[in-house]
Amino acid sequence: SSAVSVAAATRRTIVLRGINFDFDRATIKPEFEGVLDAGVEALKENADVRVQVAGYTDSVGTDAYNQGLSERRANAVLEYLSTHGIDGSRLSAVGFGETNPVADNATDDGRSQNRRVELNIQ
């Protein structure tokens, strides 16, 4: 969790490593709640920042469908943060669909990495 705190204090974007979504899903898996809880603590320690929750998808599916899916993923994380003590006025959610991949969409592993959410510090 200290790595998340440092990231919150020193970087403009926090990549929630390990928070990846199943194909065609926007449900947060229970095994990822620890990472999100560390993010909650980092945000509580940095109460002056606003956060944009940005959702992404892999390249499978239409642009329009992936846009909606990325928005649902961002909203799922926003809801988690707000129900765990982060004031909703500090949070916004946006979906970027399949844009800005962090890995190669030609492989299963790459697609898995691209099904993600990032926190952008504002």
Feature map (PLM): residue ranges:
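Short secondary-structure boundary/capping segments
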Residues: 11-12, 109
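Periplasmic OmpA-like peptidoglycan-binding domain that tethers envelope proteins to the cell wall
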Residues: 25-34, 44, 52-122
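Short amphipathic
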Residues: 13-17
